[in-house]
Amino acid sequence: MHKYRTHNCNALQISDVGKEVKLSGWVHRRRDHGNLVFIDLRDHYGITQIVFTDQNLQLMEMASRLRYESVITVIGKVVARSGDTINDTLTTGHIEILAREFIVESAADTLPFVINTEKDAPEDLRLKHRFLDLRREKLHNNIILRSQIISHIRHLMTARGFTEFQTPILTASSPEGARDFLVPSRMHSGKFYALPQAPQQFKQLLMVSGFDRYFQIAPCFRDEDARADRSPGEFYQLDVEMSFVTQEDVFSTIEPVMYDLFTKFTDKKVSETPFIRIPYNESMLKYGSDKPDLRNPIIIADVTEIFRDSDFTIFRENIKKGSVVRAIPAPKAAAHARSFFDKMIEFAISEGAGGLGYIQFSKNDKAKGPVAKFLSPQQLESLKATVNISDGDAVFFVSDKKEKAAKLAGKVRIRISDELDLLEKDCFKFCWITDFPFYELNEETAKIDFSHNPFSMPQGGLDALKNAKTTAELLELTAYQYDIVCNGIELSSGAIRNHKPEIMYKAFSIAGYSEEEVNKRFGSMIRAFKFGAPPHGGIAPGIDRIVMLLAEATNIREIIAFPLNQQAEDLLMNAPNYVEDKALKELGIMLLPSARKNVEQE
């Protein structure tokens, strides 16, 4: 017999009755019934009930003193449970083990929180004792699911002719849009490596190197604030790059991977391929977001022209000053109480709106509400047709500059859906957002900057860049840039790359970078592109967000084994931490007085 176990805790069935077995695991629960002690023994695979009887009083008394989460090895006979004690929620629920001996492999101290319940302890306490937290069923299963998803991704990608690579972790800083994690060099004093925000340049260089289809389960490091769906330190992505491809080639390659993943690991309805394509400007108009949740049936409409010559002075004057008016329908909400409309107005104001107009179209064909009296019957009919609403519906209005109005309308759209419970249940709805702006105005400097990935190919190529003379014309330029969105969550960004040095120099010069600076920051890639670079493109779906959706987790830390907390601290390993002065001296680093003060205080 094996030293620790003949079976795992999820293996024994009614067909095993009469066998002598050995099991090892953690004491999950203990119940003392006087003449009987029951222990639920748990391992990675499941739970088996162990029973100690008063026929071996000493053994039973020892079992009654076992602390939860102690590790034990038990030897005993498999017996059938009586009919009224069968537990159909357990795979092993038809049997139990009548113990004849056990060994304590490792006794547990008093637990800082309860393991055998789904009730959450404070998160920082859980993260400090993550090795205990990971024993809980839901979290344990999430980590197993993550492994299965990544394994299946590898299978899907290799089956499609992709080669898996590992790119460097110590590299140079590049402008990916977030702060770098910097690593000082001991051998090159005063110089720093950066942990990669993404393997962007390396995967493009692999295409230049003649490889055709690259993928990597890539760790990425960004020094940015935490969110519910974003870890503050590192995350993983399915990094993909392909040579000699168009945008549609990328779509048709990734769509079946996403569809296969989501249909394999969930019973929910998944969007059929091909996924719907929505240009960026259309998405901002109809949904008020470049990450639309298509489970929400509400579609925003532009009603600027209806109000341009209306008697509603506020909107009419706004339009004269360059603002727009967006209408957000509220299906079957016309008969709702005044409190519903007041609550919506309060919400809009809390989001920065000056107010929120509305009209109720009652079933007797009467329009009421604060805005209705300012519109003629013809304008009201035009409004109903434009917004696609009918009697019994209500409609809300926001008016502001185009970009702000879009975002406000998008937030109102989501809030209406929540209030009216409109969100379609038990489904994953995918879409592509395409034709992103190539440039944007930097909010701090008011200068032209890249909107997304600076390595994207502008639509129209070099001619488009040369022909755009004004700021307005530059902001109208679009890129071969795309996002894949599922249920309102951006899973990935991607692009067809700019593989021509002359276009890259021009694109960067418009954003304020000299040719010398481009060569300094991206010299390796520019140099490579001068020796024959294939047209190429790629994408990088976020592994963590995919697992979050499939695990139905609301917090990204619930699908990562050892995450940082929201303050970017590893409470288990006590990181970040201070290092000795000797190590700093070797690296040529001296702490500022404010940083030195923090060291001394701790």
From Swiss-Prot:
Task: Give UniProt keywords alphabetically.
Answer: Aminoacyl-tRNA synthetase, ATP-binding, Cytoplasm, Ligase, Nucleotide-binding, Protein biosynthesis
**Principal cellular location given in the protein's record:** cytoplasm
Gene Ontology CC terms, in alphabetical order: cytoplasm
**Entry EC no(s):** 6.1.1.23
The protein's annotated catalytic reaction(s) are: tRNA(Asx) + L-aspartate + ATP = L-aspartyl-tRNA(Asx) + AMP + diphosphate
| Family in the record | Belongs to the class-II aminoacyl-tRNA synthetase family. Type 1 subfamily.
Which protein, by its recorded name, is this?
Aspartate--tRNA(Asp/Asn) ligase
Report which gene this protein is encoded by: aspS
